[in-house]
């Protein structure tokens, strides 16, 4: 037995040689749906306006992609592109976070504004981009939105605003909250001039944005399953000590309760806006 113990064969050692061929998929080629996890070609997904082929989930669009989808080619003129936030309250690390988001998104702030044409009809537009500070509303967002609204009022143009926001920007305190009233005043002047304001609420539209300019459109539209509300679901349940419906704060729930005029699939977004603008154009002739 001892002889066998000392004479047992040693296990052979093997060296694993990795295949020199690189099988990694280049970054950006594929996109995974955040809801159903299906992996799709990014190019094909973009051609479908970032709507998942499998579960129909509306994946976020960038501000410029949204504008491209609803406007005639080459018709968009951007306003106030270089406007950027200061740090009025000297909030720690605020400017560093702003700079980081600027590098990540290529934007100066969380809203893009300007004029464009849709089927030859000119309109003013503001599109929020939730990639930048979660679309939170600060002084620059309020100022840019007011400027484009005032331009539309002076030039008698309809105005379309796509909201996507987590609410007021806490780093700017009361200055951020002031934008709720400021934008509402500009919209009132636009309304008094007999002009059309279309509010298009996308996922998510919450907090101070939902409580101000996002909810006061002449026509309020939304995308399917968009989260729309003021306070969070958990906060409300704890406050009223009741269980809320499963579909609470969804676009469909708001439509059912009269707070939206229509829930529009993104593939029908351009056509729907064109039809509304044509009706307004005929009425105001």
Curated annotation (Swiss-Prot):
Keywords, ordered alphabetically: ATP-binding, Cytoplasm, Fatty acid biosynthesis, Fatty acid metabolism, Lipid biosynthesis, Lipid metabolism, Metal-binding, Nucleotide-binding, Transferase, Zinc, Zinc-finger
Swiss-Prot/TrEMBL GO biological process terms: fatty acid biosynthetic process; malonyl-CoA biosynthetic process
Any one Gene Ontology cellular component term annotated for this protein: acetyl-CoA carboxylase complex
Enzyme Commission (EC) number: 2.1.3.15
Domain CoA carboxyltransferase N-terminal: 29-285
Compartment annotation: Cytoplasm
Function recorded in the entry: Component of the acetyl coenzyme A carboxylase (ACC) complex. Biotin carboxylase (BC) catalyzes the carboxylation of biotin on its carrier protein (BCCP) and then the CO(2) group is transferred by the transcarboxylase to acetyl-CoA to form malonyl-CoA.
Oligomeric form and interacting partners: Acetyl-CoA carboxylase is a heterohexamer composed of biotin carboxyl carrier protein (AccB), biotin carboxylase (AccC) and two subunits each of ACCase subunit alpha (AccA) and ACCase subunit beta (AccD).
Protein name per Swiss-Prot or TrEMBL: Acetyl-coenzyme A carboxylase carboxyl transferase subunit beta
Organism of derivation: Staphylococcus aureus (strain MSSA476)
Species lineage: Bacteria, Bacillati, Bacillota, Bacilli, Bacillales
């Amino acid at each position: 037995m001892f002889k066998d113990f000392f004479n047992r064969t040693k296990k052979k050692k093997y060296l694993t040689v990795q295949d020199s061929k690189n099988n990694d998929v280049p970054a950006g080629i594929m996109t995974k749906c955040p809801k159903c996890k299906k992996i799709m070609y990014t190019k094909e997904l973009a051609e479908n306006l970032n709507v998942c082929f499998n579960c129909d989930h509306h994946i976020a669009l960038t501000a410029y992609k949204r504008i491209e989808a609803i406007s005639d080619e080459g018709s968009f003129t951007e306003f106030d592109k270089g406007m950027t936030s200061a740090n009025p309250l000297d909030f720690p690390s605020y400017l560093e976070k702003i700079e980081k988001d600027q590098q990540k998104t290529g934007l100066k702030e969380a809203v893009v504004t300007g004029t464009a044409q849709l089927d030859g009809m000119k309109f003013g537009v503001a599109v929020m981009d939730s990639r930048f500070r979660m679309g939170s509303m600060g002084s620059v967002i309020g100022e840019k939105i007011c400027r484009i609204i005032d331009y539309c009022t002076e030039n008698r143009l309809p105005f379309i605003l796509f909201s996507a926001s987590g609410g007021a920007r806490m780093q700017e305190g009361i200055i951020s909250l002031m934008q709720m009233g400021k934008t509402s005043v500009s919209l009132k002047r636009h309304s008094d001039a007999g002009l059309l304001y279309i509010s298009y609420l996308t996922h998510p539209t919450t907090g101070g944005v939902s409580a101000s300019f996002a909810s006061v459109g002449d026509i309020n539209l939304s995308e399917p399953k968009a989260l729309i509300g003021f306070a969070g679901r958990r906060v409300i349940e704890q406050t009223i000590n009741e269980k809320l419906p499963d579909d609470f704060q969804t676009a469909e729930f708001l439509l059912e309760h009269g707070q939206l005029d229509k829930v529009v699939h993104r593939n029908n977004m351009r056509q729907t806006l064109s039809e509304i603008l044509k009706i307004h154009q005929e009425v105001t002739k």
